[in-house]
Every structure is written in C-alpha cells, then in structure tokens.
Amino acid sequence: MSLRNRTNPNSIYVKGILKFPGYQTNLDLHCYVDTGSSLCMASKYVIPEEYWQTAEKPLNIKIANGKIIQLTKVCSKLPIRLGGERFLIPTLFQQESGIDLLLGNNFCQLYSPFIQYTDRIYFHLNKQSVIIGKITKAYQYGVKGFLESMKKKSKVNRPEPINITSNQHLFLEEGGNHVDEMLYEIQISKFSAIEEMLERVSSENPIDPEKSKQWMTATIELIDPKTVVKVKPMSYSPSDREEFDRQIKELLELKVIKPSKSTHMSPAFLVENEAERRRGKKRMVVNYKAMNKATKGDAHNLPNKDELLTLVRGKKIYSSFDCKSGLWQVLLDKESQLLTAFTCPQGHYQWNVVPFGLKQAPSIFPKTYANSHSNQYSKYCCVYVDDILVFSNTGRKEHYIHVLNILRRCEKLGIILSKKKAQLFKEKINFLGLEIDQGTHCPQNHILEHIHKFPDRIEDKKQLQRFLGILTYASDYIPKLASIRKPLQSKLKEDSTWTWNDTDSQYMAKIKKNLKSFPKLYHPEPNDKLVIETDASEEFWGGILKAIHNSHEYICRYASGSFKAAERNYHSNEKELLAVIRVIKKFSIYLTPSRFLIRTDNKNFTHFVNINLKGDRKQGRLVRWQMWLSQYDFDVEHIAGTKNVFADFLQENTLTNYV
C-alpha cells in the first residue's frame, strides 16, 4: 500500500452522525467517501478512547517516501447514521490524516451498489437505496479538546472546526489503477440529463401542485345506490392514538384526505409487519371489507408474473421507478370520495385520492397509466401496480434513450416518481419480488426469510393459509410443490376441525429445512428451443420447462398440481396425457407460437397424437384432448423412465415420505 497526495475525483464529503453514551448530543462529522482507499479510518479525536482496542495484528502501511507506518488501534462495529439511516462500520483504523472519518472502498462494497453523482451518493441498505447529499463545505471537527467539550455537563469550550474543503489529503490506496478523472467526468455527464429529468418528476408529495397534472381520475360505484356501509369504530391503545394523530396530520397536509360528513364509514387501524418495523413507522390501513362487497369491481386485469417476465426475455439492462404512492396520484370524483370515508381516533375523514384497501385499487393506476401510453413504449417498458420497469437488450446507449423517453413521458403526464427508490442502469434488479439478473431470476431473499419465520407449530387455519400462500407464490421454483402442500392443504377444508400435532410440526420443520435456497432459473430468450418434460403419479402431475441455449439445457420453470377426484380414477396412460396438457397450459405464454419439444417416458403419447380417433361416446374425452393439442406445434421425444430427469428429481426431492 502507498499514500497519494491528491483527492480522488471519485470521493465526496457527506454528513455522518455518531452517538456515544455520556455525550450531550450527537457528534456531527463530515466524512470523506473514497473508493480508492481500501480501509475505513478515523481520528482519535472523534471516537472516545474506550472504543479503541489494540489490533491483534498491526497493519503495516508504506507511505510515499518509502517509510513504513503501523496502524495499531482499531474500533469494531461502530454504528453511524448516514442519510437518516443506521449503518455499521465493521472495522475502523485509527489514523490522523487531517479528516475526521474516512469511509473506504470496503464500506462502499458492503453497502453496494454504491452510486455517486455530482451532488449526492447512494448506498443500499436492506435492499433499499439511501440517498446522502454531498457537503460542499467540509470541516474537521476532531481536534484536541473536541470530545471533552461534547461530554454532558462539560465546561470545556468547543474548539473551532477547521475548513478542509480545499485541503489536499493523503489517503491509503490499494495497488492498482484508480478511476481516471476524465472518465469520471464523462460518466457524470452521461447521466446528467437523466438526473435532471428524474429530479423534475420526483417529489415526496404524490399530488405535488407544481409537478402533478392531476388528470388521472377514478370512479367507485355501489352495486345498489341505496346501500349505506357502516362498520362500527374500533378501540385504540394510547400509543396508537398518538401515531394516528401524527399520520392524520401528515395526510391532511398532503391534502389526500379531508374531514367527512359521509353516511358511510369504515374503521382504520395500524399494522406493523416486517416492512413497517424496518422503517420504524406503523402503517395506517382502512378495513374496506364491507365496502368492497357493496361496490362494483374493475374489469381491468393486472398482468401476471409470467406475462411481465416474458416481456424482458433477452434483455440485459434494467431501470425501475416507483411511482410515489401511485394510487394517491389518482383523484376520486366527489361521489366516490364519500364511499371512502373512515373513522379513527381523530374523527371521520374521507379520501380525495384512491386509497389502498379498495378492491378496485390495484388495477386503477396501471390501467390509467397504460391507457396514456402508445404501443411504442410497451416495447421497452411495463407497469405493475405502481412500479415501472424499463428494459433494453443492446446496451447502455439504447437504455439511456429508453429511460429518458419514459421520464419525459412521466413529466408530460404529471406522474410523480420516488427519487430514492429509483434503480438505474442495472444488470441485476429487484422487481415483482424477484431478483432478475441477466437471463436468470429467483425470488428475493425476503420470500425465503418469510417462510423460515413461520413456527413449526401453526396456530390456526389463517396462519396456515399464509404459509401455503407464500409457497404458492414461489411455486415456479419448487419441484413437486403440489405433493408437498397436500398434507397441510387438507387441514383447510371447510368441514374439518382444526388440529395440529407433533407429526405436523415435524413435517413443517422438514419443509423449511429442505427449502434452504431457491434455484436461479434461466429466462429463455426468443430464439431458444423450448422443451417440456412431464410426469404423472396416482394423485399428482408435474412438469419442467427447459430451454436449449448454445447446445446447453437450462431449467426455466417447475409446475405441479393435483388430479381432481374424478381424474384420479383415470387410467395411468390418461393421467400421463392429462399431465402434458396441464403443463402446456401452465407454460403456454412461452410455448405460443413457438415449436417446442415434448419429452415423456409414456410410449402411448406418441401414438395418441398421431392416430385419428373416431370420436364415439366412449372416446369423447380423448377426442377433446387431441383437438386441444392440435392448436400447438410440437415434436415428441420418448425417453426411458430411467432417463426421465424430472421423474427422478421428483422422487429424490419429495417431502411426503419424510413424515
């Protein structure tokens, strides 16, 4: 390692906050972020002596004049607040370099992806981006007497800070090339237009009067216009009353709600799930169950996950944007506002905008957004609820144009985005609860975490429904899920009495034990040859979608299901035929209009698709199946049962034999 004597153009000053017991206030420091430095360092004058320890292994550093110096003091796991969020510095070395605290490349990598612009940087914490503004005038506070002056009841005057903005500092660097200053300036220039446009369309207020065109409107209608929905108010704890007071004031300031004289009323309550605990704030929810029963639905269907994933086939680079409280950007007409009236400790209010909780809500924003876009945007952009995904397949230049087009369209329409949630020019991106990574995809880690947080002993049917719901969400990634679910699914029958025993708990434990991770599945490209492999047993059917790419086969999806009671009486050959049909239906969005290959270990299937059935009464079912299959273009390849990878895989991974 060596020292250099000029500021890395890839580094900036940001405000960091340290807090120690016994000190009268937070220690506000100007931290230097330097991707060229391999270490995090701090002055002994900004961290109390008791937090420093002697390093087990002193670090030898070679400086510019060839002299070796030793870093002997280290501070471990130091919390620091940046951009309002709590980060942890794993290891911090003591070194007097003329700045209070330096965040090196190891810190940037820990909270990657690390993105920097001319006026701010982005770290990522718990899969959320944290925006931290750049300080243009930096000071060194850590001088002799600073810590003493900050102690509670201290009579020591606080030393004057030193302006270090223009100073030339010496920083530790690891062997290798640095980011060239000219290259850095080119990168900043390249994104400046997108930065400026994103700034123009972003706001913390979803109906910002300076940016929103407020043209998006919606109507909610009662099935029977004479119906009055009244659900009695709930009781609230003192802490909930305080939280309601804060949130109602915020909503009134945003002008998304107003006091109501409506004859309708639905109760509001607070929820605190994992997401709410992470952000440290409960979420207000209105129980519109009764109102949803009394109102007409919306005919617009949301695209399913497979439809959206099909759109990004072959794409290599992505950007995503979160519409700021997307539903709140859609205004309600006066009659519809009355239907949204809710009660809370502060009184009776109604929404000026579409609230969360209405059954029509999920489709309102994407329908309105989609109707405002021409088909040209659908080639590289899709919308799901209030998330916008932009995707390109030829490189950054094309993607730059696509992103700029969408941002300009948002500005024209007055659609407000959340700046802090924007993800730009990513080869890997989180969307729809999935991690999409250049041709592969798998559920995000929190899906697996939710599964493992369920106790082995389930309390009631509702809790079991939630558990099975998460498994179903991840069904594309779990072979033979139908047979795994079956022992638990039977407990949800309406006429069954709830029971749970030790054997059930053991089964739950084994399910979680076997779900250690989700596989990364291949996302087929348009020119790939597609293959399905199927199998059937007495009660279940299953299949795999594969793709042949550059002479290699990749697994794309799993599918499985149960035969109905009547179907379980079919002959085994018929079950094999039905399994093929079910698997084709499951993967039809990929198989139409492609020519694909069906692999099966059932010899009768090849015979079945080639014979001409007479269509008499006894063969009616087979005739219907044959006619249905005729709409698809496929070849058939028979494989021996011993070579049916899918069947073998199912046998090896089934959980039903564990209990």
UniProtKB/Swiss-Prot annotation:
> Native species of this protein?
Carnation etched ring virus
The free-text function statement in the UniProt record for this protein reads: Encodes for at least two polypeptides: protease (PR) and reverse transcriptase (RT). The protease processes the polyprotein in cis. Reverse transcriptase is multifunctional enzyme that converts the viral RNA genome into dsDNA in viral cytoplasmic capsids. This enzyme displays a DNA polymerase activity that can copy either DNA or RNA templates, and a ribonuclease H (RNase H) activity that cleaves the RNA strand of RNA-DNA heteroduplexes in a partially processive 3'- to 5'-endonucleasic mode.
Q: Look up the record and give one Gene Ontology term from the biological process aspect.
A: proteolysis
Q: Which reaction does it catalyse?
A: DNA(n) + a 2'-deoxyribonucleoside 5'-triphosphate = DNA(n+1) + diphosphate
What sections of the protein cross the membrane? none
Under what name is this protein listed? Enzymatic polyprotein
Give the family this protein belongs to, as stated in its UniProt record. Answer: Belongs to the caulimoviridae enzymatic polyprotein family.
Keyword field: Aspartyl protease, Endonuclease, Hydrolase, Nuclease, Nucleotidyltransferase, Protease, RNA-directed DNA polymerase, Transferase
Q: Which Gene3D superfamilies match?
A: 3.30.70.270, HIV Type 1 Reverse Transcriptase, subunit A, domain 1
What PROSITE patterns does its record include? RT_POL
Q: Which residues form the active site?
A: D34
Which InterPro entries does the UniProt record give? DNA/RNA_pol_sf (IPR043502), Pept_A3A (IPR000588), Rev_trsase/Diguanyl_cyclase (IPR043128), RT_dom (IPR000477), RT_RNaseH (IPR041373), Viral_Replic_Matur_Polypro (IPR051320)
Region annotation Protease: where it falls in the sequence: 1-180
The Gene Ontology terms for molecular function here are:
aspartic-type endopeptidase activity; endonuclease activity; RNA-directed DNA polymerase activity
Residues in Reverse transcriptase domain copies: 252-436
